[in-house]
Regions:
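N-terminal binding-site loop/beta-alpha segment at the start of enzyme catalytic domains
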Residues: 1-76, 135, 141
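Conserved, mostly hydrophobic/aromatic
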Residues: 6, 18, 38, 46, ...
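Active-site mouth loops of central-metabolism enzymes
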Residues: 19-29, 76-95, 121, 125, ...
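Short, acidic/polar
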Residues: 26-38, 89-106, 152-160, 244-252
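Active-site groove signature of glycoside hydrolases
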Residues: 100-124
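Beta/alpha (TIM)-barrel catalytic core signal, keyed to glycine-rich beta->alpha loops juxtaposed to Asp/Glu
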Residues: 118-321, 331-345, 371
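Short cysteine clusters
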Residues: 304-313, 353-359, 363
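Iron-sulfur (Fe-S) cluster-binding segments and ferredoxin-like electron-carrier domains
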Residues: 314-330, 361, 365-379
Length: 382
């Protein structure tokens, strides 16, 4: 398992984490067996948005005696009414559901209290200015939440939330398909066939700005929908018309700026194993470029995907790293100190580029790498 620091929370989590909704139809014994397997393989981070009381109790039983082995991300505003899940902004219902979560998990706190599913700007304003944020802050002051997070599928809303300084963790949907789409407050557009009927080129700029802002400011992203609800794993369902592997989807998500972990939604032991395969996968197995390059309607032409195919550099420059740190400066009047320091620590810098062109011949996306190195050298001064 590769472990990463969860931004400014300081928490250390495995890059492959558990989204627990897939355990809903399992017995307590089956859930405990899956948790045994997860622990043996280094998984220490889980997300639980589901309000289903039986699922919560089964996960609590699986955690019994080993609560300390997990960083738990539990959701506020997810309640159980009339035998089904409901999203709410009612503070009393949200508090009662959160207290039910703690009781059923057998713990008195969660590391991350995730304000659940905020996709519309009006909803975000209600959350930030109303009783829900006050509730989250109160729970944090009481120690029942250690850090506040927010989940969203809309990059504009997510960016607005991140800029407030009120959240430390963002749960966001990341995969190469969604990254092409413009912002929307209707999550259903992410799955709609008509969204992909026209030509789409490069990562949507709102998403790129969100990822780079989070990287700069230490607001960490944990990822949902890395497989696009499973569609990206199927040639019949993928908008690309060709399947990706779980490892390729995970590699894509885990190489985006700001991302620390992926909450893999797994319904079987085989699916947990498929996600864990990322940890031991070869560079060839992680390589997602073959699934993305050469598509008729979809193009990432000229956009650095941080895939590393440009390597090896004749003088040893980490080209993907230089591009990432340069891109992090673009929206800033001054270079953030954290970005400047990360660039300084690179063993070789953009000014060392000899313009041999070897990297450009290797790049599957036609990036003007030599030009990017000149821009980075001018920006950073070396």
């Amino acid at each position: 398992m590769e472990y990463r620091i969860l931004g400014r929370t300081g928490l250390k989590v495995g890059a492959i984490a558990l989204g627990c909704e897939g355990f809903a139809d399992k017995t307590a014994e089956e859930v405990r067996a899956d948790f045994d397997f997860a622990i043996r393989n280094g998984i220490n981070f889980l997300d639980l948005y589901a309000s289903n009381p039986e699922l919560r109790s089964n996960i609590g039983a699986a955690l019994a005696g080993r609560r300390e082995k997990f960083v738990i991300q539990g959701h506020l505003c997810s309640v159980w009414e009339g035998g089904q899940y409901l999203r709410t902004r009612d503070p009393e219902k949200s508090l009662a559901a959160f207290e039910d979560l703690l009781a059923r998990l057998g713990t008195d706190y969660v590391e991350i209290g995730m304000i659940h599913y905020v996709d519309a700007e009006a909803d975000l304003r209600e959350v930030l200015d109303g009783p829900i944020m006050r509730l989250a802050q109160r729970l944090r002051s009481e120690g029942r939440i250690r850090h506040i997070g927010l989940s969203s599928h809309n990059p504009v809303v997510a960016h607005m939330a991140a800029r407030t300084g009120l959240i430390d963790v963002l749960m966001f949907s990341v995969n190469p398909c969604y990254d092409l789409l413009p912002p929307s407050d209707d999550v259903d557009t992410l799955w709609a066939d008509e969204s992909y009927a026209r030509e789409l080129h490069n990562i949507d700029p709102e998403r790129q700005r969100l990822y780079e802002f989070c990287e700069r400011e230490g607001i960490v992203i944990d990822v949902m929908k890395a497989y696009g609800g499973g569609d990206l794993l199927s040639d019949a369902n993928s908008p690309f018309g060709r399947p990706m592997t779980p490892v390729q989807c995970l590699e894509y998500a885990l190489t985006r700026p700001g991302v620390a972990a992926v909450m893999a939604g797994c319904r079987s032991r085989a699916e947990i194993e498929a996600a864990l395969a990322w940890c031991s996968a070869t560079a060839a197995e992680r390589d997602y470029t073959g699934a993305l390059a050469g598509l008729d309607k979809f193009s990432w032409e000229g956009h650095c995907m941080y895939c590393g195919h440009c390597a090896p550099c004749s003088v040893g420059i980490d080209i993907a790293g230089v591009n990432k740190y340069y891109n992090l400066t673009l929206a800033q009047h001054e270079i953030p100190e954290t970005v400047r320091e990360h660039y300084r620590l690179l063993p070789h810098h953009a000014s060392e580029c000899i313009a041999c062109g070897r990297c450009e011949r290797n790049c599957p996306f036609g990036v003007d790498i030599i030009g990017h190195m000149r821009l980075a050298a001018a920006k950073f001064g070396y």
